[in-house]
Amino acid sequence: MNRRKFLSVSAASMFAGALAPRLRSDAPAPAASGMNYAPRGKPHPVVKPGEFPIAAVRLDHGHIYGICNGLTEAGATIKWVYDPDPRKVAAFRAQFPQAQPARSLEQVLADPEIKLVAAAAVTSERGPLGCQVLAAGKDYFTDKAPFTTLEQLAQARAVVASTGRKFFVYYSERLHNEAGMFATDLMTQGVIGRVIQVVSLAPHRLSKASRPAWFFERDKFGGILCDIGSHQFEQFLTYTAATDAKITHAVIGNFANPDHPQFEDFGEACLVGNTQALNYVRVDWFTPDGLSTWGDGRTFILGTKGTIELRKYVDVARDDTTDHVYITDEKGEHRIDVAGKVGYRFFGQFILDCLNRTEIAMTQAHAFKAAELSLLAQAQAQRLVTSAAS
């Protein structure tokens, strides 16, 4: 059975009948802040030990742990870790003791064994760092958002074209979420017909006291649509099979953080894809402390033959477990709990793409288009005059 047929059969088998109730231990422990979102799955190595050596550098964001969880579960070996702050290196090695501390980034890039460099630098530094990595002959995997300016994106596209290396992005709200990946398979099968609209609601908990200073500086974090919005635009492109889109509306605001006037705690945007599908995105930093996890992220997909709702991280006041998929179609109503049943196949596919120079996990054009849309939405957004910003 080929891979595509296997995925189709696997998704169809879960959709065909109600799944047995899953234990709470099947779900990842909820993180207080999305910055610490680092799912752990079951190991499914696609390479032998030592066959895919990687390095982790610039540990400015906690997503580096999620990136490395996914890669090591797929068989990658972390050979080096580097950050100017030795405390970050020590914390990283506590979870990944196999990683040896490098003296410098240059030492990492000079190692001919290293095939991939993973990073979670300050957002404004991710694009230039990636170009440096690619120029050294390595593939690059960065946390989102990969860029804060369109100029950085243009430079990265040029370096990818000249080097042939991969510049990939950790769009974790789909790639590292089982409900999100299950929906990917459902779209491939056409379960709800042609997709008309995708609505993404992406609230996050701010946890202000734990955030570094750069997180609140506009030139460094890029803006809320550039940051959290990049996840949502990537999902829209995937679920609608669109390869491009136009921004028709974008708004940003700072409603509750006057102590950080450059910060944006709310944003929304509307898009029309080149498939004529529509997208509405709402992103915010207003998850209340009473919620059991960092955000009640939801995705609503409207098709010509049904609807899909993803309750990714919690089912509020009903079930504090994760990865709930609700489907309505011509046959009825369905709830499918997919935690522990889908896995995180992107990482293994990505490793094989790096080795085989293929594009099974995701195309380079797709990764860059999601980033481009987030940058365009941010640039076109009307900034609301609020009491916090005035």
Language-model segments: residues:
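Active-site loop of classical SDR/Rossmann-like NAD(P)-dependent oxidoreductases
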Residues: 62, 87, 318, 337-348
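C-terminal helix-rich "cap/oligomerization" subdomain common to oxidoreductases
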Residues: 8-48, 116-118, 274, 349-390
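Beta-loop-alpha module in the N-terminal Rossmann-like domain of NAD(P)-dependent dehydrogenases
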Residues: 60, 96-159
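Hydrophobic residues in well-ordered beta-strands that form the structural core
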Residues: 56, 142, 149, 167-169, ...
